[in-house]
Structures are given as C-alpha cells and as structure tokens.
Amino acid sequence: MNSLLIDSSNPSYDAMNNDNLKNSIEKNHPVKSKVLSKKINNVDTDIAISSFADAIFITISQNQKFNTWIRASKSDGILLDEPSYQIDTLLGNNQDVLFSIYARQLIENIGETSNKSLMLSISITDKSKDTFKQILSTIFENKVW
C-alpha cells in the first residue's frame, strides 16, 4: 500500500531519508561527539571526544580499557588575572604525573574558549613525548567544544 505522502516505490527514498535524518540528529543533538581510531607510533589509539552542556568528556585508550579517571576544571585566579586549574584523579593511578599533564594541557585548551570542565579517561601504554604530542594534536584537530 502506497502512502499519499511517501512514494514507497522509490528505492532510494529510504537511504536518502536515513541520511537526512542522521544529519539532522547530528546537527541538532545537544551532545557533540567524535570517535577516532589512529595508529600513533605503531600503537592503536582510540580517542572519543564528547561535549556536553557543562563538561567535555575525553577518552584516550591504547589497550581498550578505562584505567585512570581525572576531573579538571578552570576557575578565576584569586590574586592574579591568570586562571587557576584544579586537577583531581578520581579513580586509578594518581602517581603518574603524565596523566595530570595530559589533563592540564586539555583543560587549558578547553578554557580558552569555554568554561566547561573536563572529565578524562586515560589508559595508554606508550608514554613517550612524541606520543603525547600526537595524541594532543589529534584531539585539538578534532575539537567539539
């Protein structure tokens, strides 16, 4: 049975309609997200970035796990015009300074254009300086905030 509004005899209608619906949802959805998989220094690296109304959620994983969770936020400085940053390890390894450095670099970049806080989940196996630079570069090239 054919609808008066929809020409169901057109096989390209469903595909075209699905693409339009997907584009509409992506444009109008309040949460903006990107998911990336990239080989960084021969290590498969998965990165997911989501921007919510009040926070940015980023996951970085080289072993398909969520090991360390860090919350970072920016606030106005008390005595100086410089902002201050609060970095808290909520779960996992709080002894690894590199994870706090990731969080600090990310929240500083987020803070340039937004007052959103950061929730970071990080689990990396390659802790080299080059990997650090490539991961941050990939995130900054694919910002959703």
Curated annotation (Swiss-Prot):
Signal peptide residue numbers: none
Stretches that traverse the bilayer: none
UniProt keyword terms in alphabetical order: Chaperone
InterPro entries: Proteasome_assmbl_chp_3, Psm_Assembly_Chaperone
A biological-process GO annotation: proteasome assembly
Similarity field: Belongs to the PSMG3 family.
Function: Chaperone protein which promotes assembly of the 20S proteasome. May cooperate with psmg1-psmg2 heterodimers to orchestrate the correct assembly of proteasomes.
The protein, known as: Proteasome assembly chaperone 3
